[in-house]
Amino acid sequence: MRRKPKTLPPTLRDKNRYIAFQVTGERPFKKEMIKKAIWDVSLKTLGELGTARAKPWFIKFDEKTQTGIVRCDRKYVEEIRFVLTLITEINGSKAIVRTLGVSGTIKRLKMKFLKEFGWK
């Protein structure tokens, strides 16, 4: 029988922050387009090492309201917000990504910043 590895106590786990964002563009965008744009701009701006340290992770995107959630390390929130503002083109069409807010939990992020867009 294989034993499960022990889980890390909360004091040793990575502290994450969740960033809510909204995309405004010439046309509606799909989830994969947004994910690729965030990843590409992050690599260009922060480099491979900076991106690895910031740990940006695409959580969710609603294609109807064009809003989504990105997770990152708490020390690199400003860098990821900067990366989001640098996105000017997604898949050949112009776009603007606006940061709605930052929170420590997805539940609180949805309540504070994404409730007006119909998130539950």
UniProtKB/Swiss-Prot annotation:
GO terms for cellular component: cytoplasm; ribonuclease P complex. GO terms for biological process: tRNA 5'-leader removal. Keywords: Cytoplasm, Endonuclease, Hydrolase, Nuclease, tRNA processing. The keyword Hydrolase applies. InterPro entries: Pop5/Rpp14/Rnp2-like, Rnp2-like_sf, Rnp2_archaea. It comes from the Archaea. Its EC number is 3.1.26.5. Signal peptide: none annotated. Pfam families: RNase_P_Rpp14. GO terms for molecular function: ribonuclease P activity. The keyword tRNA processing applies. Its main location: cytoplasm. It catalyses: Endonucleolytic cleavage of RNA, removing 5'-extranucleotides from tRNA precursor. NCBIfam families: PRK03717.1. Consists of a catalytic RNA component and at least 4-5 protein subunits. Part of ribonuclease P, a protein complex that generates mature tRNA molecules by cleaving their 5'-ends. Belongs to the eukaryotic/archaeal RNase P protein component 2 family. This is Ribonuclease P protein component 2.
